[in-house]
């Protein structure tokens, strides 16, 4: 019998378990992960951006807290007194506006962001050209730049978090959830593909883009669907000035990766 079962052993499920175990040591927690190597996991394959460039206060506060955690990650994940360092590239984050509507929203968001203490700068086309002379930005009306944001090593974060949770008593289980046992509208058990049933008091849906599918298995729907994202790695023949994770008004992103860069776009028109 478990106190809590996390469906998903990536960063979302892992951090949920870590917070619970810090608050209440001794909880019996299991994390069910269908890809324990994380070779196909969204957490490991993401661009791993960490930013304060949000339009909702709740998201911004969570991101500010995330900065605290990742900024002290090594000490927070220490095992036997030994820090578990995490690489965090604080090279900045930028959104570009290509339409008047995007520029207006960006200016409105800037008021919220700076009002909550975030370091965010608005750049017009001239200032943007000075900062990124290698970028073609003649169709950019406005940009917002957060110099203290960036990206981290997602696989390093995953493995360190997993080891820390296991040291705190959490159990990671390889498996695929196929259904839930329920009684009086409450989930009481999680059934896995191999046939075993795990009894629990609470279930946390931490499956990210697949959260909608898991919720349907519980008997209700949430507006969460997976979106395909295409990413490519490339290198430049000529040297480019240092820059952070950058996203234009069409949703195309680019950031440094090793000796080159990764670029990609989410296909919103292919939801599901």
Task: Locate predicted features.
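Conserved Rossmann-like nucleotide-cofactor binding loop
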Residues: 12, 37, 210
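Active-site substrate-recognition segment that forms the wall
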Residues: 18-24, 34, 43, 50, ...
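A short, glycine/Asx- and small/polar-enriched loop/turn
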Residues: 101, 132-140, 181-188, 239
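Helical element adjacent to the flavin cofactor pocket in flavoenzyme catalytic cores
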Residues: 144-202, 206, 210
